[in-house]
Amino acid sequence: PRYIVFGGLVFQPLDTNLFASAKFDDVTVRRLYTDYMPKGLFQKYRDVVILTRIESDPITSQLGDFTGFAVDKINGVEVTDLKHAYDLLHPEKTPEFHVIELFGANRPVVIPATKAAEAEARIAKAYGITKMENLTD
């Protein structure tokens, strides 16, 4: 499956398999899934990107309630697909913080950019992750 692991956050595109295997409590995610084709959301979003997991790490210790939400914006830019999300999380000029806005969340997820790479190294080692992203089917 396609995915991104960034600073302990795991992002995946919403598809039928993910929708069937995960219990999404967020009404917005369910609505995005059911409206994707009938209401033409595919014209705006090639993928609906979901924050599916938050791996345990000091950088993510306060972020437990954000799993299962759809990503709206990263660093102020509306996300159109998984590759776009990856590009926004890995810009040429790194910001001080990565701000990830989720549809329906009370506040954004904020990750200190300098700590994201350190967290990824710890998480890769702890969970045996050899590749932090897979952007192709």
Show which residues each predicted segment covers.
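C-terminal recognition in membrane/secretory proteostasis and scaffolding
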Residues: 1-137
